[in-house]
Amino acid sequence: MRRGWKMALSGGLRCCRRVLSWVPVLVIVLVVLWSYYAYVFELCLVTVLSPAEKVIYLILYHAIFVFFAWTYWKSIFTLPQQPNQKFHLSYTDKERYKNEERPEVQKQMLVDMAKKLPVYTRTGSGAVRFCDRCHLIKPDRCHHCSVCAMCVLKMDHHCPWVNNCIGFSNYKFFLQFLAYSVLYCLYIATTVFSYFIKYWRGELPSVRSKFHVLFLLFVACMFFVSLVILFGYHCWLVSRNKTTLEAFCTPVFTSGPEKNGFNLGFIKNIQQVFGDNKKFWLIPIGSSPGDGHSFPMRSMNESQNPLLANEEPWEDNEDDSRDYPEGSSSLAVESET
């Protein structure tokens, strides 16, 4: 009886957490919808008097708004990618590992299993990176998110504002979302500013639109400052080919710690996120090279690194399609030892 109540309570808490995790997204959506109304109707259709100016403002605004909304949608609804089945322990290996009580034997078991996989990063103690919750050997740059309850390929962070884990599958979209958000706020601020001055000087009648125009400038400037800092930080990460987690915790390779282990040079670093074809760099469609399991590394020469030698490290003929759990609103990654 008591166990049933505990299970029901636990299920209810999980349900509440899932609902609450969408609150930050709802806040952003409501702010954006209000900004659309304030700019299109209160500014362009009511306050701006010149027909030509109205048309120019509306065309440019909607062009930016489409890409802003598109990238936000992709950041939210592009599911995080998990390691495929080759990195999961088989049922037999899982039972052997769980039943083995000697830590040194467990470590050796993981070492033997990892020899068959393209895994070059280690824990701080030099052990094979293993997730005891997902029961898999973690690919390079993969981390477990305790919020999403799964391992995420090339995990950057868990973002509450998109209610999703940002990783290999959607980092490009997230970066584009930041860029178009900055552009969106900057465009609103620059076009609204002259009318803000006119209202301030009393050159325009004090009507209902005054509140929307004045508050629109304030909100645009506030978001612009915070977003440009975040966008600048992620641009720096891309230029170094780092994730947020790698910036805080230096990756450890088989040869030892190396903070620039994935740094291939500025252009190649950008291509690792956006791909080789520049015409796709501004469009939110998947163009990041690779499969998220293996990455070129600066710390290895071409004879050691199959990706730099243009060779396939391993083949996967199995169907790896699956449903991934939904994320929730906090940042949580397992600690590695």
From Swiss-Prot:
Membrane topology: Multi-pass membrane protein
Main localization, broad class: Golgi
Topological domain spans for side Cytoplasmic: 1-20, 78-172, 235-337
A family per Pfam: DHHC
Keywords per UniProt: Acyltransferase, Golgi apparatus, Lipoprotein, Membrane, Metal-binding, Palmitate, Synapse, Transferase, Transmembrane, Transmembrane helix, Zinc
Record-stated family: Belongs to the DHHC palmitoyltransferase family.
Name of the protein this chain belongs to: Palmitoyltransferase ZDHHC15
Gene: Zdhhc15
